[in-house]
Amino acid sequence: MVHLTGEEKAAVTALWGKVNVDEVGGEALGRLLVVYPWTQRFFDSFGDLSSPDAVMNNPKVKAHGKKVLGAFSDGLAHLDNLKGTFAQLSELHCDKLHVXPENFRLLGNVLVCVLAHHFGKEFTPQVQAAYQKVVAGVANALAHKYH
């Protein structure tokens, strides 16, 4: 559960309505893989991840980034029940994929940076603070199975 004020919730929702999920998803996942190269081990089947350009232009990275942001969108629609919303994904990432839960926090922070880059002055300190709460809540929900 994420505790947002009415203003914060409105700001998150308003900005998210302008997000190009295809573009931002691929960019966020790509940046995660470039900045934290050890995360690439979870994506062996994605082909060429040998350079930043290869990662950022990889169609499988872009497609999976879109899928990740689709799940994030579901979370935004269920902020009062993030653990329930992400229960299956938490189980998958814990039991089958063995993804360290810290990676969820890293991806959330990268997503905030990508949103700031795309929205510039519209991504005010107040909007950033609200999004930090949301990505922390999502990361916590995804890590729930690990506890």
From Swiss-Prot:
Function of the molecule: Involved in oxygen transport from the lung to the various peripheral tissues.
S-nitrosocysteine PTM sites in chain numbering: 94
Gene Ontology cellular component terms for the protein in this record: blood microparticle; haptoglobin-hemoglobin complex; hemoglobin complex
InterPro entries with a match to the protein in the record: Globin (IPR000971), Globin-like_sf (IPR009050), Globin/Proto (IPR012292), Hemoglobin_b (IPR002337), Hemoglobin_oxygen_transport (IPR050056)
Keywords: Acetylation, Heme, Iron, Metal-binding, Oxygen transport, Phosphoprotein, S-nitrosylation, Transport
GO biological process: hydrogen peroxide catabolic process
Oligomeric and partner information: Heterotetramer of two alpha chains and two beta chains.
Modification type N-acetylvaline: residues: 2
Residues bearing PTM Phosphoserine: 45
Residue ranges constituting the Globin domain according to the UniProt record: 3-147
Tissue: Red blood cells.
Top-level taxon of origin: Eukaryota
Name of the protein this chain belongs to: Hemoglobin subunit beta
Record gene name: HBB
Signal peptide: none
Binding-site residues, heme b: 64, 93
Family statement: Belongs to the globin family.
Modified residues (N6-acetyllysine): 60, 83, 145
Example of a GO MF term: organic acid binding
